Curated annotation (Swiss-Prot):
It comes from the Bacteria. One of its GO terms (cellular component) is ribosome. Belongs to the bacterial ribosomal protein bL20 family. Binds directly to 23S ribosomal RNA and is necessary for the in vitro assembly process of the 50S ribosomal subunit. It is not involved in the protein synthesizing functions of that subunit. Keywords: Ribonucleoprotein, Ribosomal protein, RNA-binding, rRNA-binding. The keyword Amino-acid biosynthesis does not apply. SUPFAM superfamilies: Ribosomal protein L20. This is Large ribosomal subunit protein bL20.
Amino acid sequence: MRVKGGTVTRARRKKWIKLAKGYFGHKSIGYKVAKQAVVKSWTYAFRDRKQVKRDYRKLWISRISAAVRLEGLSYSKFINGLKKSNITINRKMLSELAINEPQVFSQLIAIARDSE
């Protein structure tokens, strides 16, 4: 007699369909398509956890660059001037200073300009 393994198979398939809850169309109903969609979503999630860090760094650099150009200096010369002056502030903090504390940021620009 053939053993179908009903409850075990059903539980395994239900697990994948539960993970695909909220997906559009047959991806939330059909086992095979749901499993493919979930695995692909995990791939995207892994990739984008890395990508979001790069995106934030780009955002901070563009904010710093815009603020520095108002003072007539390029981003690369500003960063180089800070390094020569032994000022180690990360780009996130520089971006926050440029937005929230423009006076302090302009002092940093002056220091970077003097060190060249």
